[in-house]
Amino acid sequence: MDRRRFIKGSMAMAAVCGTSGIASLFSQAAFAADSDIADGQTQRFDFSILQSMAHDLAQTAWRGAPRPLPDTLATMTPQAYNSIQYDAEKSLWHNVENRQLDAQFFHMGMGFRRRVRMFSVDPATHLAREIHFRPELFKYNDAGVDTKQLEGQSDLGFAGFRVFKAPELARRDVVSFLGASYFRAVDDTYQYGLSARGLAIDTYTDSKEEFPDFTAFWFDTVKPGATTFTVYALLDSASITGAYKFTIHCEKNQVIMDVENHLYARKDIKQLGIAPMTSMFSCGTNERRMCDTIHPQIHDSDRLSMWRGNGEWICRPLNNPQKLQFNAYTDNNPKGFGLLQLDRDFSHYQDIMGWYNKRPSLWVEPRNKWGKGTIGLMEIPTTGETLDNIVCFWQPEKAVKAGDEFAFQYRLYWSAQPPVHCPLARVMATRTGMGGFPEGWAPGEHYPEKWARRFAVDFVGGDLKAAAPKGIEPVITLSSGEAKQIEILYIEPIDGYRIQFDWYPTSDSTDPVDMRMYLRCQGDAISETWLYQYFPPAPDKRQYVDDRVMS
C-alpha cells in the first residue's frame, strides 16, 4: 500500500544486460543527426534481442533493491522534485524534421531510486546508443539540488520518460512512464487519471505484493510527421522478467497502445496480473460514505466494465468499502474489460483541482487468445483521493511455475469512451439510499417502521423504447435478503428507465450481499448485466434516527 500511495502522490505534482556491438564512424554520424543526446557506443538491437535478454536475465539472481541515491536527491521533497525540468532543447527527437512527437526524461530523486537506462534506436539499421545522465540535460530551478554531487554520475540513469504531441511539444505531455512499471496517458482533455502497469504480482495473496520495474527503454527514432512511436522495455523483478513492445498511437481524441510482452518466470508466482490498471474511487452516486466534502463525487473511475468471452456485457459499479474486498470474475478468452469514467458532467464533481470530469477511461482489448482465467477486482478502503484504492487485472487460470514462459498481446485505449459498447441497454448510473417508503414520500412525516436500503439503477439505449409496450421485466438475483417494492420508472431527461427496489435483510449477517440484475422482454435479455456488492450495517445500526430538535 505504501508503494501505491507514493506513486499516486508523485504522479500528481525507475541493470540492463547489454549486447555488445561494433561502433563505426557511419553509425555514429547517423545517430548524431537523429539524437544529439545519445552518447553511448552502438550496439545491435531489435525485439528478438530484447526477448533473449529477458530470457537470460531470468536465469540469474535478481539484483535486489536499488543502490542509494546521492544525498541531494534522496532527501528531496515532492515540491522540489517537481521543480526540476528537462531542457526542451535537448529532447530526444528535437532534431527530427517536422516532428509531431517529442520525448523528455524524468530526473532521479525522492522515491524514484531505481535506475532506468534509456537508448535511442535507428530503426533502419537496428543500432542503439545509450543516453547517459548528465546534469546539463536538466534545469534545476529552485529545487535546491547540489549538482556537484552529480558530477561524474553518468550511470545514474533516469526515473522515466514522457512524450509530448504537437502543438504542445514542450508544454503538455500525453504519455508518461514513471515509477516501477506504471504508465499513463490522456485523451483530448490532457487530464491524467488512472494508471496502467506492466505487470502485477501477488496483489491479493498471503505474500507481500511485488512491484516489477521497467529498468530500460529503447526508443525507435520517430519518423517526420508521425504521431505513432515505438518503445521497447525490459521488465525485472524478484519473480519474473519480461520483454515489452509498445506501439503508441497519439491520436487527436485518444491514445491507443498496442502492447506485446514475453514473460519469463524466475520462481513460482501465486498471482500473476496481466494488463493491470490502478484507479481511485472515494465516493460517487452509489457510495456516499466518504462524501462529506463540497464535492458530490470523487473518483478516477466509476465502474468496471467487462465484455465476456460468451458475449455477455457486465457493469460493476465500484465501491469504497470499509474492509478490503477482492472479487474474481471467471471468464474464457475475454473480449475486453476496463475501468471507465463515463460521467463527464462538471456539475457532478464540482472540482477545479482534480477535474475528475475530464479523466480518461481505460479499456483492455486482448489481441491473442488468453484462455481461461479471472478478471480480478480489488477495492481498498480509503479516506480520500490521494490513494489509488482500485486494482483490476487478468489472472490466467494456469499456475505460474519457475521457468514458465508466457506471451500476451493486447491493446489499451485511453479515451473518454471505450471503443466498443454493449448493443443492449446500458447502465448509466447506480444510486442507493434510504428505503422502506413510497417513492415521492421521502420518507414522509414519520420514518419507516422497518429498515431497508433502496437501489435505483438507470438504464439507457438499446431497444428499451420498443420493449416498453411489450413489458420490461427486471430479473434480480440476491445472495441474501429480499428485493421488494420493485418499480420500473421512465426517466424523461435521460430517455431511459430506472429500476428501483428495496433490499430487506432476512438475517443479522453483515457479509457482503452480491446483487445481479438484467432486463428481460418476452424471455430475451435486453440489457447488460448489473453486478453490485452491498455491505449491510450491523443489526443495531438498521434503524432510522430522528435527530430533530423541535423545541
Swiss-Prot record:
- PANTHER family noted in UniProt: GLUCANS BIOSYNTHESIS PROTEIN, GLUCANS BIOSYNTHESIS PROTEIN D
**Annotated function:** Probably involved in the control of the structural glucose backbone of osmoregulated periplasmic glucans (OPGs).
Q: What is this protein called?
A: Glucans biosynthesis protein D
Name the gene behind this protein. Answer: mdoD
Q: Which UniProt keywords apply?
A: Periplasm, Signal
Q: Per the record, GO CC terms?
A: outer membrane-bounded periplasmic space
Q: Name one Pfam family in it.
A: MdoG
Modification after translation is described as: Predicted to be exported by the Tat system. The position of the signal peptide cleavage has not been experimentally proven.
Biological or metabolic pathway of the protein: Glycan metabolism; osmoregulated periplasmic glucan (OPG) biosynthesis
